[in-house]
Amino acid sequence: MTDGADMPCKAKYLLVVSMDVDPDHEALFNEVYDREHIPNLRRVPGVLGIVRCKREELVMSIGGETRTMRAENEPAYSAIYELESPAVLTSPEWTQAVEAGRWPTQVRPHTRNRRHVLLRAMSEPSGSLTS
């Protein structure tokens, strides 16, 4: 798993991919994601950075009180891909990378509750708004 050293984000687009994995395949999931899937996708032109995350309990102050926030059915694992453009996601290099290695045959079939969300940044790293 990456340590967040790629932050802060300087990309105009973020792809957030989230999923759960069958417990019996969790070790393989993490091994393949870290050693194969991310390295393959980092080589794709237009991929500026990748960080993996695992959901944790969220306790925060909001509305004058401390609350435990619960997001029903939120997947346990997420990967955030920093992209130059949404066109990266349909490039031949991306198409090849997402089907490389053990991911499509040994890991993907054991994932569920998958979500893919594309976000466009509304501010520059300095905090100024973009158009």
Regions found by a protein language model. Name each.
Residues 1-131:
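Macromolecular interaction modules
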